């Protein structure tokens, strides 16, 4: 390791060297930095940063064999497909079920990991992964698809929003509690991104998105668009379109593929 870091410095002269390695290796990097100090390379020692992460437990079978990634994904697909078929609200063709199930399986694995502190250890499980009203990947995907559906049902109003060069001047948002909470949360997206980058903690963004999805659910229930006066409907749709934009970009940022239909 000592020879390797010296060689890297010779080749790249980087500003820093970041090692994303299991937290059990913390002592290893402490010793590496000490060795560099001993050979009077404190400058290089200061460049080394160990970013530890916790281990995922519960991936061993009853026979003691660690499950392969494709086995975990396949198991998630089976559970997701069963959930989709039993759901009374999800309306997709049979031909779409397998692709949707694969998406939900992958989304669950990603969110299950990234919603926790990077350094924490946890037991992996699909328990509650496909339960409604939980802080899980299903929540993100369902709320995104619902916002897409809302935009499609109000296509003419969406065209007006797209054509309006300066909608914030022409429209006034209602200042009700649901609107205030959702707007305030949307305003905090940049802060969540910066904090996640600064602390190297993906959970900052993931938790933000789960909170956003919950706020969207509450807002949709109380801020109707269909059947409302034109200006009110337009302002509400603008709010939901902004929420979908942030939700979509945030989901893609953590590695999810947002579903447009569920």
Regions found by a protein language model. Name each.
Residues 1-262:
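Non-catalytic interaction-recognition regions
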């Amino acid at each position: 390791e000592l020879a390797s870091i010296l060689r890297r410095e010779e080749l790249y002269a980087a500003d820093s060297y970041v090692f994303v390695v299991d937290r059990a290796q913390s002592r290893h990097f402490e010793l590496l930095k000490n060795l560099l100090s001993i050979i009077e390379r404190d400058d290089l020692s200061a460049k080394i940063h160990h970013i530890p992460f916790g281990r995922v437990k519960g991936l061993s079978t009853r026979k003691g064999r660690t499950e392969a990634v494709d086995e975990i994904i396949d198991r998630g697909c089976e559970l997701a497909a069963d959930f989709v078929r039993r759901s009374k609200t999800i309306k997709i063709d049979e031909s779409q079920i397998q692709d949707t199930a694969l998406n939900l399986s992958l989304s669950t694995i990603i969110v299950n990991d990234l919603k926790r502190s990077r350094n924490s250890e946890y037991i992996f499980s699909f328990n509650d992964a496909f339960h409604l009203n939980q802080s899980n990947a299903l929540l993100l995907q369902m709320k995104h698809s619902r916002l897409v559906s809302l935009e499609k049902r109000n296509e003419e109003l969406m065209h007006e929003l797209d054509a309006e060069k300066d909608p914030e001047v022409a429209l006034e948002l209602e200042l009700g509690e649901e609107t205030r909470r959702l707007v305030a949360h949307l305003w905090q997206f940049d802060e969540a991104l910066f904090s996640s980058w600064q602390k190297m903690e993906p959970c900052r963004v993931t938790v933000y998105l789960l909170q956003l999805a919950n706020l969207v659910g509450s807002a949709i229930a109380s801020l109707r668009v269909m059947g409302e006066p034109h200006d009110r409907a337009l302002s509400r749709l603008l709010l939901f379109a902004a929420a979908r934009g942030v939700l979509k970009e945030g989901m893609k940022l953590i590695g999810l593929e947002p579903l447009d239909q569920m």
